[in-house]
Structure formats: C-alpha cells, structure tokens
Amino acid sequence: MDHLAPAFQDDCIVALATGAAPAGIAIVRLSGKRSLGLARRLAKLPEPMPARQAVLARLAHPESQQPLDEALVLFFQGPASFTGEDVVELQCHGGIKHVEQVLAAARCAGARVAEPGEFSRRAVRLGRLSLERAEALLDLVNAETDAALSAARSQLLGAVGRAVEELAASAQELRAEVEAALDFPDDAGEPPNRLAERALHLAARCQELLATHRVGRALREGARVVLAGAPNAGKSSLFNALAGEERAIVDEDPGTTRDCLEARVDLGGIACTLVDTAGLRGEGAGRVELRGMERARAELERAAVQVWVTDATAPLSGPQGDWLVVTNKCDLRPGGGGLEVSAKTGAGLDRLREAILERVRGTGQARASSGEVVITHRRHAELLASAAGAFARAAENAGRVPLEILGYDLAEGARALEQVVGRGVDDALLDTIFARFCIGK
C-alpha cells in the first residue's frame, strides 16, 4: 500500500495517545523503526526487550538524566503492531505538566511530534488498516449515542469493507470475462442479456448500500432540529421538555426568548441538536427582538427538521412548506389539530420524538448491530453512487456497444469501489481525511 503514502518518512514519531487531561495514567506512544532505540535513551530496558510484555522502568531525561517517572514500557514489534512499525508505549502518570516533560524528553531523544492522524496513516500505508476502517476509528471516538457507536464499531470491524470488496471482486470478475471475449472472439462467451443481468445486479447492490446513507449520515453527524413559531406558543417549554432540563427561561410575557438556545439530545439513536428560537411575528417587535428573529430565520435555514409550534388556545396556523406542525398546550384545549403535545404534562412528547426521528432518518432505522452494513460517510456514498452509475451504463449498453466500452464501465465501477477501502486514492484526499484526527491517533 505504498501508493497511499505522501513523502513518507522513516523517522520515529511520538504523541500522547490518551486524553490531554489530568488522569491516573497517560500513554505516550512512539512509532518507527528507531522507536525501541529511542526508548532505551529514556529508560534502562532489558536486552533483548520482550515483545508485548510490560516492563517496569524509570524514565529519565536523555541528556540531563533528571528522573521523570516510574513507568510501564511495552514494546510491539512490527509488523504486529497498530501502525505496522515497531511501537513503544510508555504508560506513565497522567498529570498535564508531567506528560509535557515526558514528551519533551522523547523529542530530545530524537522523536518527532506526530502529525494529526499520522499513527493511523502509517497503519493504512503498511496495510494494517484499510482506509474506511481508519475513518471508523475517528467515528468511534466521536460517537455520542449507542447507535452511532454501534455503526462505527461495525465499520471498524470490517462490515463496510467486506461488502464493498465483494462487489469490487465481482465487478473485476465480470470485466475479466469481457476482456477474455475480446482476446478470444471465437469462443462462446456470456450472451449480452446475461452480462446485462450481472451488471444490473451490481448496480442494484450498490443502491441497496446507498439506501442506508441517510440514516448512516444522521448517526455519524447528528441532526439540527429547530423549534419556531409565534411568540408565547410554548416553544421554550417544549424545548425544556425535550431536553429533559430547564435550559430556557419560560414566562407568560411574549418575546421572552431573544436569542437561540441549544441542547444536545439523543432521539432514537440520533444525536440531535435541539434549537429554541425567538418568536416570529410581523408587528410590535423591538430592536433586540428583531435581531432574535433574524437569528431564528438563519437557524431555520440550517435545520434538518423545522418544527412549527402553535398554541392550542389560538387558531391553528403555520407557514407553507415542509414543516412538522406541533400544537402545544393540548392540556388546555385538546383537539386543536396537528400533532398535539403538552410540554406541561408530557402528553404527546413520545409521538413528537418519533415524528422528528422519521424526518431525520426517512424510512431507514437508526440502528446498526455489529456486522450490519450502514454507510455513514459521504465519501463512501459518493463512490457507491459513481459505481452504481457505471454498472447501470454497462447493463444498458450490453450488446449495443463494443465490448471495450463495456469493459471500461465495469473497470470504472470497480475503481470507485476500491477507493472506499483506500486503493487508488490520492495524497490530497488522505491529507483531508487524517487532518481531522487528533495527534495521538
């Protein structure tokens, strides 16, 4: 997988692999062919150093010999390590200043501070991780809900990669048969209708995977749900009820909410950002309230779901468009129309949560059990769409165009699928992907 590396260096890199906060234990990780030699400059280690066995050692600065810590040192000999290179982990005490000194000592010994995601990038380069599994590592760290964690874990364990590799192999097999027919035209090959069926099956399978992307993207990125409506419709009360805590000030006077408030909530496995906004009205608003209304309209433009909250004691009204219309205060006057809820009693809140979730995920389900294939990344979805288009063209043109063109379409589809797992991608894309990682990953 050397084609994945930018000007890849054989130097030794170092970074904190655990969180940058006070903790009982911190793990400082070194990777590179000189990592064990550098570790010996920091601590007296046995010769030979046993692999995968913890060795208790005293760390000291390589030049001043000032004692630093008593740590556990573990050596992972490449290629049987995370990066595929020799890796040394120093398990030391986790004070922030203390870890800074250990890292400084490692740099003094000859290590270079790792770039963001460089450990994972080296693992991809040396074939320890496929690209989509490396992406799943970041998703695993950032997951906010059980469902998002399950989707990330499934991808990390190879569910997406296996599905895509299987499709790519089938496409390459079909392409090889087309090329064999070109090389040996007198031999009886697959009839055009059979070639079309097989290409169409590949396209359909790509579309099946693509159909999971709407819910997959919501699992990974979350969704923005904005509550809007006239002043005093009960938006802030509803916001507090959905958030499960008193975040917004509630008062009988209209126009109490002047700015936008946010709360992160788990709705059926989707991490939703719930936004409370200033009431929207045409007349009577002061200067500050008008600014709040401007911010409310800006939030609505960003929303994945727009919820229009009305008051059950007032005539049912709502804007035109694809809004989820909710009638609040149904405890005061039931039968007001729309989706009836009461922020005060909690009536209808479960139905509201489900209605929001349906709009976020469409017909999919916000669940991803271990091994289930869910497409969470836009990059993967775009490549699957490209592959589906290429296979569909091949199916449509079978028997109508020269076999060379058919083979080209099949090859194009296979290449798109292979890029999902990292084959044939360029350095600029890798730079973009791994720049999102923290330094220790």
Q: Over which residues does each language-model region extend?
A:
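Glycine-rich, N-terminal phosphate-binding loop of Rossmann-like dinucleotide-binding domains
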Residues: 30, 92-94, 242, 277, ...
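Generic enzyme active-site microenvironment
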Residues: 274, 309, 326
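Switch II of P-loop NTPase G domains
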Residues: 75, 278-308, 312-318
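Switch I (G2) and immediately adjacent beta-strands of P-loop GTPase domains
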Residues: 56-77, 255-284, 305
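Short active-site oxyanion
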Residues: 24-27, 89, 305-306, 320-324
